[in-house]
């Protein structure tokens, strides 16, 4: 099913999807690929860090509950690394209590989507955060050039 695009990805933005649920991975990967994104997959924090070492994605869709290190702890690690801190992290999880949502933002997430996922909503949020990150990067580069 083709979802109406909110905004086409800028030159095939790279999105890392981190989730241990095969059905969620399949659904997200299919939808992202249809929209023109390049998709990287990780099933846990260790794999996610390995993907970051290979290629820094433009955004991360991150489950909070995974085997081993949870998504909140992984997000904190990503945000503590200067070369990765700019990457927007969108949590997607079944944890719906206010304290859990607040923890997602406190750990460095820019957004929080409660499962079950609504693909058009996830795509719209992702496009917005990618656009905001792009504008922020351009501003940082302009300041760097201006000195």
Positions of PLM-derived features:
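Non-catalytic signal-transmission and effector/linker regions of two-component phosphorelay proteins
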Residues: 1-16, 131-133, 137-147
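Alpha4 helix (beta4-alpha4-beta5 surface) of REC/receiver domains from two-component response regulators
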Residues: 26, 73, 85, 96-111
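Charged docking surfaces used in two-component/phosphorelay signaling
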Residues: 26-34
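Acidic catalytic/metal-coordinating carboxylates
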Residues: 43-47, 70-74, 96
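Receiver (REC) domain active-site loop signature in two-component systems and cognate sites
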Residues: 66
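C-terminal output helix
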Residues: 117-130
């Amino acid at each position: 099913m083709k979802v109406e695009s909110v905004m086409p990805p800028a030159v095939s933005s790279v999105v890392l999807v981190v989730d241990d649920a095969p059905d969620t991975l399949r659904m997200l990967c299919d939808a992202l690929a249809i929209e023109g994104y390049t998709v990287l997959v990780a099933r846990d924090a260790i794999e996610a860090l390995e993907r970051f070492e290979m290629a820094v994605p433009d955004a991360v869709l991150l489950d909070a509950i995974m085997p081993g290190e949870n998504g909140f702890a992984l997000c904190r690690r990503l945000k503590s690394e200067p070369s990765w801190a700019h990457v927007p992290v969108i949590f997607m999880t079944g944890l719906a209590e206010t304290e859990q949502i607040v923890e997602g933002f406190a750990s460095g997430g820019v957004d929080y989507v409660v499962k079950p996922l609504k693909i058009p909503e996830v795509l719209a949020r992702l496009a917005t955060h990618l656009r905001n990150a792009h504008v922020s990067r351009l501003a940082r580069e302009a300041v760097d050039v201006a000195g």
